Amino acid sequence: MPMMSYAQNREDVRLARAFAGRNTGFYVDVGAHDPVKFSITKHFYDLGWRGLNVEAAEGLARKIREARPRDITLNVGVSNRPGSLTFFQATADAAGLSTFAHDEVERHRAAGFRFTEHQVPVTTLAALAAEHIHEPVDFLSIDVEGFEREVLEGSDLETFRPKIIVVEATRPLMTEQSHGRWEAILLSARYRFVVFDGLNRYYVAEEHADLAAALEVPPNPHDDFIPHEYQVQIDALRQQLDDQSLPIRVARKLVSATAAVSRFAQRRDR
């Protein structure tokens, strides 16, 4: 059966190669956003994995928590020190732009996007790992719309050591790469850069360098996957066809029933 890919840029396809045959594992998703749409972890959860989801938007965190009872889902932000920060939450039609990064918000506002502001408690990745993670971490995903450096500055990558780290590496709604602000943190922690996929940069811990080969090749027909958004459209079209064909099916049944009644009446009259 083909793999169902939910991630925006097929990140889950590359990761599925790296962890082929694994029905259990542990992931950390900082900036989890949604339990299904563009989720880098949905495929793995469906296999039997579990993990830690961090989402600063209260409604989205609640949605993830309801959909993922095996997971730990926290409604907090992640930064380089604990405390409280202003979270800029975009309107629902652009929810993926929500961020703690003030400079990115100003650019988006100039382009016409609207945000509401909330004070949200923040902690560090190191503190989250110490409190909630008690097993090896297979992969970490960071998708925080311009706040990557602060997240990585608050990590302890010698103690909390995911095998693979995937970081969104372009500025929101731009092709400009942003890794110059934060990549040195990963390299100094003995992570090796593997590949840039046009949106994200992938890194492997040097002691797991054997996983790099599985990440290097772009998703392709050999991966045997179906993009979830395509499946949604297919299912919707099937439903439309079913709805449109209902009158035809009813008419056919009516004709069949009428013919049966007519035959019965003819036999009765003989």
Q: What residues fall within each predicted segment?
A:
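Phosphate/nucleotide-binding beta-alpha loop and adjacent structural elements of enzyme active sites
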Residues: 1-270
